[in-house]
Every structure is written in C-alpha cells, then in structure tokens.
C-alpha cells in the first residue's frame, strides 16, 4: 500500500457553445377557422367591392349635365368646351386634373373646382379674375384686370357689372392687333386706371362725363363730353415720366378750368406745375348787309 490518494474521476465537460437542451411540452393552438366576426368582415368587403363595381359600371352616374357656379364674366361656352371631353364618363372614375387645367387656362378664371351632384351632374365652381377696366378698340370691348390681361371680349349682352366699370378708348395703331389673352403695358394700365377713375366733380367741371383716350400723337387724353375741352396728359414711362405725377396734373387741370371751362378748347399738362391752355376760337361777326 502506497501513500497516494486515489484520484476522483471528473464529470465529462460539455462542448463549448452547446446550448442547454430543455424539454418543452407541445402547445396546442386554436384553429384559425372562420369565426362569425371574420365572416362578417369578409362579407362587408365583398359587398363594398360589388358596390364600387356597380357604381363604376352603372350608366346612371355618367356625366350628362353641367352646372356652372361663380361665372359672372366667363363665357359658359368656354367652360362647356373645357369639360366636353369628359362627357359620358362615369363621375366616380373621372380624372379631374386635365379638366381643371383646361378651366384654369380660360383668361377670366383664376381658379376652378370640380364636384359632382348625383346622379350625373358635373359641378364647376369658378373663382374669376377681377376686371378693373373696359378697354375699347374700335367696335370691340375687352375686360382688363389690374395686371393688364385682356380677359374677355364683351358682346351685346354684357353683364351689368361690366357696364359699371370705367372705360378707356384706345385709338393707337398697335391696338388693332389686341385680343383676348394679350397683356397690356403695366404703365399704360396704371395711367388708364388713374384717369378713368376721375369724375367731373373732382376737377370742378360741368361736363356730363369724361372719356379717357389713348392716342399715338399725344399719349393719354381726357375729353369732356359732350363737345367739350381736351386735356392732354401725355405719355408715361417707368422712369423718365412716371404715372405718380398724375394726381398733381389733375389738381393743375382743376385750377386751369376754374372760371373758364366754357372758353377752353384744349389744355396741355406738361407736369404737376406746368400747364397751358388754348382758348376756343371766338365766333366771327357776320357781315352786315349794306
């Protein structure tokens, strides 16, 4: 017998990284069968799909009538032409973007909206540009907004609102080429708007009315009607002869007319301070018989 201690056997080591194995009991899951709630949801989806198909396929919702709202100055025929390509299409499937683009291209229209009124009516609502003047060229009359855009040509049945707007007569040669969609010079629009807003009372005149005329020879003129004097305001530019001298010219005109209006044939208003007038020719005395 030796003095050595007996060695104990070590338990076997697990391989590195080996996961501990646990036994788990199998879990029984509920069957994914068709419950009443799920069946109801499926039925609702099917009914919605059939309803959408029915609306899209039914001719009862085809575009057949047009209703226009907000059109004071806009020609209804222009609106009709803009939406005519959609005639007969289903209103629920209608793409409105191309129609809105056509409507907004009408000069009198600033913006437009499209809606529907069942069963088959397309509703077009217009936001119109605001006209500030009537621009007369020969026998033609055009609505003009504050940006100088010729919005619409007025016919014989112009709306009452148009008849209340101040008017400008354009006798310049280049105005013969004007038409709807043309944009006037901003300086001309500014001068015309200022002058066309004047009334006889503002310049102490007894004239029945005042007419603003744009000419090639003298620029802007103010004519007292019927058969009165002519005040020559002249040409205006953005820098050299600005329209902000017009209020001073108007005050000068009132002073020159005071007490002598019936004697004046024409007045030239060079600026706010310098103005001259030409009197009417005195009637010649008739020859006395011998």
PLM feature spans:
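Glycine-centered tight turns that cap/initiate beta-strands
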Residues: 108-111
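Short extracytoplasmic
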Residues: 63-65, 71-105
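Charged, solvent-exposed interaction patches on well-folded alpha/beta domains
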Residues: 1-54, 61, 81, 113, ...
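Structural motif
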Residues: 58, 86, 101-104, 160, ...
